[in-house]
Amino acid sequence: MVEHELYHYGVKGMKWGVRRNLRKSTDFQDSKKNVKRYHKKYMESEGAYYNAKKKAEAQFDAKRPYNPNMSKEQHLEWNIDRYVHVLNKSNSSAKNRDRAKQEYKQLLQDTVDKHRNTLVGDIKITERQRQRIDRIIRDELVKDLFKD
């Protein structure tokens, strides 16, 4: 094979630079895309429907709800995945990073609230006691985050 030869794809007599559409109707392609897009798989462990392709590609699904039956380790791993997801979403511009930090703070506050609700339940506590519980929970989350 010579390096300087010029090759042409398609049919003889066809214009150069114009690709011939092998399938005249686009119905097949559209339906194929729709199958990928709308094919959802029921996950019994989470009790919800998820896009099968996305679930296979990434372990983390941002829309997955908080599960109060998670163990502490599973919850911490889930929280870290949420943080990584938020950081990946912010491309690297300072504005996006600031927004990602705010989102993470909100996510962390939500998790602390959920932990507090599971620990305390409907018991009436003072604001000072609530702040103390929140601080203990945050300290535990941070310790577990940076534990080797």
PLM ranges: what are they?
Residues 1-148:
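Long, non-globular targeting/processing and low-complexity regions
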